[in-house]
A protein has these predicted regions:
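Short, hydrophobic/aromatic-rich segments at coil-to-beta transitions
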Residues: 42-44, 74-79
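Short, positionally conserved secondary-structure boundary motifs
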Residues: 1-55, 86-87, 94, 98, ...
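Structural motif
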Residues: 62-63, 77
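PDZ-domain C-terminal substructure recognizer with occasional recognition of PDZ-binding tails
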Residues: 88-112
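Short aromatic-glycine motifs in intrinsically disordered, low-complexity regions
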Residues: 81-82, 110-116
């Protein structure tokens, strides 16, 4: 990741998403976005999302995914996978000998495999970043 992210101020207190609370502007600490977003820099890659198949998981077209290749993928995780040399982002389903890639949007079908298909999990999605403005 870029050294541009270095550190920024983070409020020590949380901000309620319900009823407003009194603000305390003097309590801030420094946080490194690099260390917050990336636990293993040598195995972390950023991908830009293209498409709408994962909106139910909060991943939208244009989002930036932080993907860690050093994490062993398990059932239920959102992963970047290759299928016959094509990449996709889906939720990994791995139960009772069945493996498939699940979309998180009912308008898209899950991806199942036949013997001739080559599928591998490329990495595990650890963050999805979206620009609001």
């Amino acid at each position: 990741m870029s050294a541009v992210l270095q550190t920024i101020s983070q409020a020590v207190h949380s901000v309620p998403a319900g009823f407003p609370a009194a603000a305390n502007e003097s309590s801030h600490e420094q946080v490194s976005l690099d260390s917050y977003l990336v636990s293993n820099p040598a195995s972390t890659v950023l991908f830009r999302v293209r498409g709408e198949s994962m909106t139910g998981a909060g991943i939208y077209d244009g989002d930036l995914l932080v993907v860690d290749r050093s994490i062993e993928p398990v059932h239920g995780q959102v992963v970047v996978a290759t299928i016959n040399n094509d990449m996709t982002v889906k939720r990994l389903y791995k139960r009772a000998g069945e493996v498939k890639l699940q979309a998180a949007n009912p308008q898209f079908q899950d991806i199942t495999f036949v013997e001739s298909d080559e599928m591998s999990v490329w990495g595990v999605v650890t963050f999805s970043l979206r620009r609001w403005n």
